[in-house]
């Protein structure tokens, strides 16, 4: 039987690989890794002789180079014996033209039809010719092109060094287009205004797939849906289906929906038409529909095209819920336009929204927006990819650990990480502000070179940034550890088995073919550390932690309380692995049917129904754990406590003596204490005190010490002033601390105010509940399978620990 889950996991693994198969680079002999060139020539690339033979090329052949974002260039190929077989050497100018960096992959194809040019038009970049006198042609262009036969591609930039200057030129036009070889007979035009550097940099910074991080699976889906039909429509024709028409991207704000659409347009070289939802609306009758029609007509003319509708929920809300006639007409118009897109036309409509459920249902059927792709909150790996993208042009100090930052930024989306990087950089500039004078025309080069963003700057930025998508329910990773909690060893073990094992050892559950338990309920007197335990386990396995206070889910509006529950569970799934902590569970999970009269039409009944269905629907693949805490286990609906939901019921009792000692030590770990203060004696004399009561004693002792310290300082200052008034000589002020530490006297005084928050009567109630639970569990104490006696080598059942701190009683 154990082989079944393994087989299943292999199948799932294969499906995962297939889902991202489109992203894998195909291994071809002409795809080579880019390396730094040893000779700085803009027109020459070098490969090994063996690679030239394999590709059927000869020294001096012209080749076409294909880089990223559909950029192409041309060059002359030569052999270099020191070049490894899988690499190609090229200089920085060629790399920039292809939008690639060292280590990227470039493809090389022969260009036998590349002819000599009749004319070319080149223009200089403005900031490289400032203050230049003399003829550009005679000084720069003529010697450069006479030196060798140079191939050029439209859009290329090349640099020419002469007269102690380096000038950059851009190829505006070539005849024949798009590339040619410049020979002595080629006419060179260089008239016209120089090209502005800003415009050139804008085109250099076109967004491509490289600028997208944390959306690997979604990108694979989009490439299947968009690139395949645009580049190879015959694929769909051969298999006999129509290519998809529309894609709906949805997800929280800032995850990169618009960015993905722009990247796809740039990488496919398609015409890109952007419609912002609200801009379509017009007060003139019929004009809104006309705007939509024009957009579709424009795209039909410029195929292949991508029409991107941002914020589609603004123009296509549910018709039955809108009062405005205009919105209904726009939705109808959009439906007919989507249906009117010709079957084989190279037009794909992409729409984006944060609220997919508010869009008209007719738009979401097959044949319109066929695919809905969730652009969710990135995980740690995705966050690291995004951070690397945003910091690739930043100057980072050696101590910056991007991996650590990525692990700590739970719930951050791409926009939040971009903001984090810019805040860290600004903090670095603030630190250097004393060296910068705003009145100066230029900043000293030494100051500019000393700028480097440090880990300390990132730490500061992390303190100021919070995840935008989860601001309503802050997802945090707590910093509480097991050492902060005194005693409760068995409870800790049980929690580790519940939360840590499924996260850290998922293969064990696969091996035995069983789903891990998903929920636990802590019950016990108030102030015994139920919340603290939940935080510690979330921190221990690096899970997110969403704390939900029961009463905040209930609202006066019909149906909204249930929607709040749904949202909370959706957020937990997005931020998995996640511990969902329901504090005061009894406020939302009371036994149903009791309060029909006065709770707003049974709002709490509906909320508990929603919680139950969400618990049953917890996706097995998502590591979401539910921990509930309550002081009133007797009034909780029994359906919540059945196995499969909150099946582990753990009693958190009042701390025993050893635990009280631990709690006192944890509370006072940062406090200076006098040597004669005996915490063991204090723990012995606080029987029946909860953790919160003990913490209050410590706080009161600290308060008394602070009061005494301030009073003594005031008295010393008064005596000093009196002596000064009498004209006496003042002694040297040694600034002695009047109260250096907390003493026994402070604790003796604090104990006069100490009180027990849990009465004996309360404890009896909890113990009775625990006893009833224990009796209902003992059903199978004497159960044994029939058959032969067990041999000595048979595995024996684990003997339950007979601790006084038993979990369940």
UniProtKB/Swiss-Prot annotation:
Keyword Flavoprotein: no
Domain of life of the source: Eukaryota
Record bears the keyword Membrane: no
Effect of residue 467 to A/S: Slight reduction in catalytic activity
Cystines in this chain: none
Phenotype for residue 584 to D: Severe loss of ATP hydrolysis without affecting ATP binding
The name this protein goes by in its record: Transitional endoplasmic reticulum ATPase homolog 1
Catalytic activity: ATP + H2O = ADP + phosphate + H(+)
Region annotated Interaction with ufd-2, chain positions: 803-809
Lineage summary: Eukaryota, Metazoa, Ecdysozoa, Nematoda, Chromadorea
Residues given in the record as ATP 1 binding sites: 253-259, 354, 390
Residue ranges of coiled coil: none
Regulation: The first ATP-binding region has low ATPase activity. The second ATP-binding region is responsible for ATPase activity. ATP binding to the first ATP-binding region induces intrinsic activity of the second ATP-binding region. While ATP binding to the first ATP-binding region appears to prevent ATP hydrolysis by the second ATP-binding region, ADP-binding to first region promotes the coordinate and cooperative ATPase cycle of the second ATP-binding region.
SUPFAM superfamilies: ADC-like, Cdc48 domain 2-like, P-loop containing nucleoside triphosphate hydrolases
GO molecular function, one term: ATP binding
GO terms (BP aspect): autophagosome maturation; embryo development ending in birth or egg hatching; ERAD pathway; mitotic spindle disassembly; positive regulation of mitotic cell cycle, embryonic; positive regulation of proteasomal ubiquitin-dependent protein catabolic process; proteasome-mediated ubiquitin-dependent protein catabolic process; regulation of protein localization to chromatin
Record note on quaternary structure: Homohexamer; oligomerization is ATP-independent. Forms a ring-shaped particle of 18.3 nm diameter, that displays 6-fold radial symmetry. Interacts with cdc-48.2 and thus may form heterohexamers. Forms a complex composed of cdc-48.1, him-6 and crp-1; within the complex, interacts with helicase him-6 and GTPase crp-1. Forms a complex composed of deubiquitinating enzyme atx-3, adapter ubxn-5 and cdc-48.1; within the complex, interacts (via N-terminus) with ubxn-5 and with atx-3.
Recorded consequence of changing residue 530 to T: Complete loss of catalytic activity
Region of interest called Disordered, as start-end residue ranges on this chain: 1-21, 779-809
Record-listed E.C. numbers: 3.6.4.6
GO CC term (a single one): cytosol
Record's compositionally biased regions (Basic and acidic residues): 8-21
């Amino acid at each position: 039987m154990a082989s079944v889950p393994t087989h299943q996991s292999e199948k799932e693994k294969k499906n995962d690989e297939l889902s991202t198969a489109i992203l894998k680079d195909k291994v071809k002999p002409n795809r080579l890794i880019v390396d730094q060139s040893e000779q700085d020539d803009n027109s020459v690339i070098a490969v090994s002789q063996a690679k030239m033979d394999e590709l059927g090329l000869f020294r001096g052949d012209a080749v076409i180079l294909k880089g990223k974002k559909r950029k192409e260039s041309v060059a002359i190929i030569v052999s270099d014996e020191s070049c490894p077989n899988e690499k190609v050497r090229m200089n920085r100018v060629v790399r920039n033209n292809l939008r690639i960096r060292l280590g990227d992959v470039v493809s090389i194809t022969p260009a036998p039809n590349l002819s000599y040019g009749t004319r070319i038009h080149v223009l200089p970049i403005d900031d490289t010719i400032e203050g230049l006198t003399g003829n550009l042609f005679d000084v720069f262009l003529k010697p450069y092109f006479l030196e060798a036969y140079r191939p050029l591609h439209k859009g290329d930039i090349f640099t020419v060094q002469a007269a102690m200057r380096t000038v950059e030129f851009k190829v505006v036009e070539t005849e024949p287009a798009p590339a040619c070889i410049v020979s002595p007979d080629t006419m060179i035009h260089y008239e016209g205004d120089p090209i502005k550097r800003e415009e050139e940099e804008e085109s250099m910074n076109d967004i491509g797939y490289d600028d997208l991080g944390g959306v690997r699976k979604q990108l694979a889906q989009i490439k299947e849906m968009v690139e395949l039909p645009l580049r190879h429509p015959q694929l769909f024709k051969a298999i006999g289906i129509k290519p998809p028409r529309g894609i709906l991207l949805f997800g929280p704000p800032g995850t990169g929906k618009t960015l993905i659409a722009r990247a796809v347009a740039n990488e496919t070289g398609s015409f890109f038409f952007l419609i912002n939802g609200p801009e379509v609306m017009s007060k003139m009758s019929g004009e809104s529909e006309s705007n939509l029609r024009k957009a579709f007509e424009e795209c039909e003319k410029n195929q292949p095209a991508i029409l991107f509708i941002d914020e589609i929920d603004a123009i296509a809300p549910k018709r039955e819920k809108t009062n405005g006639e205009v919105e209904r007409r726009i939705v109808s118009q959009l439906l007919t336009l989507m249906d009117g897109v010709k079957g084989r036309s190279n037009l794909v409509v992409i729409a984006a929204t944060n609220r997919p459920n508010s869009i008209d249902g007719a738009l979401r059927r097959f044949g319109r927006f066929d695919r809905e792709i969730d652009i969710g909150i990135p995980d740690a790996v995705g966050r690291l990819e995004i951070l690397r993208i945003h910091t690739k042009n930043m100057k980072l100090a050696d101590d910056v650990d991007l991996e650590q930052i990525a692990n700590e930024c739970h719930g951050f989306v791409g926009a939040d990480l971009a903001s984090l990087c810019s805040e860290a950089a600004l903090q670095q500039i603030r630190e250097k502000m004393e060296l910068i004078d705003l009145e100066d025309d230029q900043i000293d080069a030494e100051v500019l070179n000393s700028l480097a963003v440090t880990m300390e700057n990132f730490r500061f930025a992390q303190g100021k940034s919070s995840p935008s998508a989860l601001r309503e329910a802050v997802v945090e990773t707590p910093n509480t550890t097991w050492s902060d909690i005194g005693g409760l060893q068995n409870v800790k073990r049980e929690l580790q088995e519940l939360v840590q094992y499924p996260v850290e050892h998922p293969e064990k559950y696969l091996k035995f073919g069983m789903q891990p338990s998903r929920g636990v309920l802590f019950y016990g007197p108030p102030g015994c550390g139920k919340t603290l335990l939940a935080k510690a386990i979330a921190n221990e396995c690096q899970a997110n932690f969403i704390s939900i206070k029961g009463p905040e889910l209930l609202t006066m509006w019909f149906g909204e309380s249930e929607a709040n529950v749904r949202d909370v569970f959706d957020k937990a799934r997005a931020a998995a692995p996640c511990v969902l902590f329901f504090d005061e569970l009894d406020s939302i999970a009371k036994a149903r049917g009791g309060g029909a009269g006065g709770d707003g039409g049974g709002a709490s009944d509906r909320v508990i129904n929603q919680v139950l269905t969400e618990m049953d629907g917890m996706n097995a693949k998502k590591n979401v754990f539910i921990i509930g805490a309550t002081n009133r286990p007797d009034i909780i609906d029994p359906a919540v406590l059945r196995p499969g939901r909150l099946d582990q019921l753990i009693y958190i009792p009042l701390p025993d003596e050893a635990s009280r000692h631990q709690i006192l030590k944890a509370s006072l770990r940062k406090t200076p204490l006098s040597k004669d203060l005996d915490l063991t004696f204090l723990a012995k004399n606080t029987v029946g005190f909860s953790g919160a009561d003990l913490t209050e004693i410590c706080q009161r002792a600290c308060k008394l010490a602070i009061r005494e310290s301030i009073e003594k300082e005031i008295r010393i200052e008064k005596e000093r002033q009196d002596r000064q008034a009498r004209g006496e000589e003042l002694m040297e002020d040694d600034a002695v601390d009047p109260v250096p530490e907390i003493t026994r006297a402070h604790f003796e005084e604090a104990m006069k105010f100490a009180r027990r928050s849990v009465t004996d009567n309360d404890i009896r109630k909890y113990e009775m509940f625990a006893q009833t639970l224990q009796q209902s569990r003992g059903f199978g104490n004497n159960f044994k399978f029939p058959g032969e006696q067990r041999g000595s080598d048979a595995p024996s059942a684990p003997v339950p620990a007979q601790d006084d701190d038993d979990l369940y009683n």
